[in-house]
Regions:
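A conserved helix-loop-strand patch within extracytoplasmic ligand-binding domains
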Residues: 115, 119-123, 130-131
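Rhodanese-like catalytic fold shared by cysteine-dependent sulfurtransferases
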Residues: 2-118, 142-184, 192-323
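Short hydrophobic beta-strand that contains or immediately precedes a catalytic carboxylate
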Residues: 137-141
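Short alpha-helical segments and helix-capping/turn motifs at coil-helix boundaries
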Residues: 83, 124-125
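Glycine-rich active-site/cofactor-binding loop and its immediate structural neighborhood
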Residues: 134
Length: 323
């Protein structure tokens, strides 16, 4: 079988991060429709479908992305689809996947309905005032490896490995978190996790719950660096790895062995070997594993030099694409 060619779409490419909570009917039929239109338009990425809605990130030419978004907005309940657009100089995905899941972002709380009980939206230009209020506790709802790349000044890091760990973390730390605080402000990459986390806190009896509308990506796009309270870069679930203000490409890369974001400082570590290990996973690798990773890296480099995509070159990104 001939290996797929590298992307030949006009540059820069358009990247669309999207989600919508709405009741979906026949997800299997919808998967076929979306797979067909994405392939027809040369669009790649991942779309997740569940009875509660749609979530994903896709990339392609501007006309191609427009066509896919038009198809999604035609789905009943998706007319107000939440979309954040950015650009990329190389295709950030190897293939197109449309998958059916129990949840479009996994929290493991089946009784939570963001359509009925999500918190109050705060637009990016009002966010600084809210999180600077001494009565506000600010919580980063993302996972530990994302927070390590960047977060808001003064935000609480739950140090969770998965979003499904968040409910137990909040219940265990509730009293300390809310001590002397009357407001809770939460944020995530694109807003979808906060739809559920704010609904969860309201179900737990917390009344004043707020979340950043459009997430970190919208904040970085709207707020000037001179006015920003963001520190670092924002991890994204594609091959760009991280973005900064204006959604410009960040300085982080990614370990091909474990998927951990790698900073420029990490690249200088004696434990970093391109395609083989990084400071986060070096101690856990056997000699046999290192040899296998080196061979895979050699094959990937050869394929790239020949203008091909190595079929095994899928980065082991940790949990797939919440936002």
């Amino acid at each position: 079988m001939q290996a797929p060619r590298l992307c030949t779409q006009p540059l820069p490419l358009c990247v669309a991060a999207l989600y919508q909570f709405c009741p979906l009917g026949d997800c299997a039929a919808l998967r076929e429709v979306l797979t067909r239109v994405c392939r027809l338009q040369g669009v790649r990425g991942t779309l997740l479908l569940a009875r509660e809605g749609i979530n994903g990130t896709i990339a392609g030419s501007q006309p191609g992305i427009d066509a896919v978004l038009e198809q999604i907005r035609a789905i009943p309940g998706c007319a107000q689809l939440e979309v954040k657009l950015s650009s990329a100089t190389t295709m950030p995905f190897h293939r197109m996947k449309v998958r059916i899941r129990p949840e479009i972002v996994t929290m493991g709380q089946p009784d939570i309905d963001p359509l009925l009980s999500a918190g109050t939206y705060v637009v990016p230009h009002d966010w600084n005032a809210l999180i600077a209020d001494p009565a506000t506790v600010v919580i980063d709802t993302r996972n530990d490896f994302e927070v390590a790349v960047g977060t808001f000044a003064g935000a609480v890091d739950p140090q969770t490995r998965s979003f499904s760990d968040f409910p137990a973390w909040f219940r265990a730390h509730r009293d300390a978190l809310l001590d002397g605080k009357t407001k809770v402000a939460m944020f995530c990459t694109g807003g979808i996790r906060c739809e559920k986390s704010t609904a969860f806190l309201r179900a737990e009896g917390v009344s004043e719950v707020y979340h950043l509308k459009g997430g970190i990506l919208k904040y970085l796009d709207d707020v000037a660096p001179a006015d920003s309270l963001w520190r670092g870069e924002c991890f994204v679930f594609d091959q760009r790895v991280a973005v900064g203000h204006g959604l410009a490409p960040g300085t982080h890369s990614q370990c091909h062995a474990c998927g951990t974001p790698v900073s420029p400082q990490d690249l200088q570590s004696a434990q970093y070997e391109d395609g083989v290990s990084c400071p986060a996973c070096h101690a856990t690798r056997t000699d046999e594993q290192r040899a296998a990773y080196r061979e895979r890296h050699r094959q990937e480099a050869l394929a790239t030099a020949q203008g091909r995509v190595h079929v095994g070159a899928v980065l082991p990104v940790r949990p797939a694409s919440p936002r």
